Amino acid sequence: MAGIKHRRDSAESINTDIITLSRFILDQQHLSAKNATGEFSMLLNSLQFAFKFISQTIRRAELVNLIGLAGASNSTGDQQKKLDVLGDEIFINAMKASGNVKVLVSEEQEDLIVFRNSPGKYAVCCDPIDGSSNLDAGVSVGTIVSLFKIHENQNGNSGEEDSEGTINDVARCGREMVAACYTMYGASTHLVLTTGAGVNGFTLDNNLGEFILTYPELRLPEQKSIYSINEGNTCYWEPTIADFIAKLKENSEENNGKPYSARYIGSMVADVHRTLLYGGLFSYPGDKKNPNGKLRLLYEAFPMAFLVEQAGGKAVNDRGERILDLVPQHIHDKSSIWLGSSGDVDKYLKHIGKL
């Protein structure tokens, strides 16, 4: 009897009613869009296939000689890694095969990709493998994605078609995103997603081949004494920014009697993931080398800002402007960024006189 009881206790400690990403997507569709066509849900499922494919490829990269440079540069002049090229191909093929994507923007492609024969109603912007320069050292990297719905015919006439796919479908205000997510490939593969109704985190179970809900309804702490910034660029910063970071390191009353702790990995996905879980401030300001900042709006700043805001935080640029209010003119336009716990971002806004 003792053996039976032990087995029963062991079984009861295992949750067998798990929520997979596919189940979560369908549940959300039934709750919030009962008349939905299912196209958006199918697109999200195509995205998770791409994430699983990239995750598996990264895990095997060193064994199949995918570590190192590919000998070319991407759209913004960064040296491409072999995995950058492969990750880009995986993403393009997955989005094309989905049949739900009309327009694709990739960091690795100089121009907009339009799937002319696709009936898709969505535009996807992505950085297939963000932080790839860290891969050789085994540091966590990730995929960042933002989703827009393409422009519908403006006159509402049944005889007129929706957009055939132009830059206008993505060169728009960040508030018009319908979803954003990132996947972090590290010790585990984590997917963090928002469709505009909060933030939820999933972990890939390699045995099941499914993303499992492990961080439901993520919320950022109001404030946390942690800052994340590349202080190797201090000599290039504007005095206002250098002064602000210096003040964070003081054990002043304003900092509750102790200095902020520095936590910087150098991979945006990993740094933002930590910030979402623990709180604090992540920043990549403009400097003398990159006055407008270095992060691309469409597939870095926009999706991360959307996620952080949906988790109760804030995201602004060096001038204190809300990231999601900005409108890019080109698909690879850049921005500075300060994001994280609302109290910590407010501290920066007060410092520059915007609060």
Curated annotation (Swiss-Prot):
InterPro entries assigned: FBPase_C_dom (IPR044015), FBPase_class-1 (IPR000146), FBPase_N (IPR033391), FBPtase (IPR028343), Fructose_bisphosphatase_AS (IPR020548)
Residues passing through the membrane, by range: none
Annotated residues for binding of Mg(2+) 1: D78, E107
Residues the entry annotates as binding Mg(2+) 2: E107, D127, I129
Activity regulation note: Subject to complex allosteric regulation. The enzyme can assume an active R-state, or an inactive T-state. Intermediate conformations may exist. AMP acts as allosteric inhibitor. AMP binding affects the turnover of bound substrate and not the affinity for substrate.
Keywords of the record: Allosteric enzyme, Carbohydrate metabolism, Hydrolase, Magnesium, Metal-binding
Reactions accelerated catalytically: beta-D-fructose 1,6-bisphosphate + H2O = beta-D-fructose 6-phosphate + phosphate
Cofactors: Mg(2+)
Subunit note: Homotetramer.
Record family assignment: Belongs to the FBPase class 1 family.
PANTHER family: FRUCTOSE-1,6-BISPHOSPHATASE-RELATED, FRUCTOSE-BISPHOSPHATASE
Protein name: Fructose-1,6-bisphosphatase
Provenance organism: Kluyveromyces lactis (strain ATCC 8585 / CBS 2359 / DSM 70799 / NBRC 1267 / NRRL Y-1140 / WM37) (Yeast)
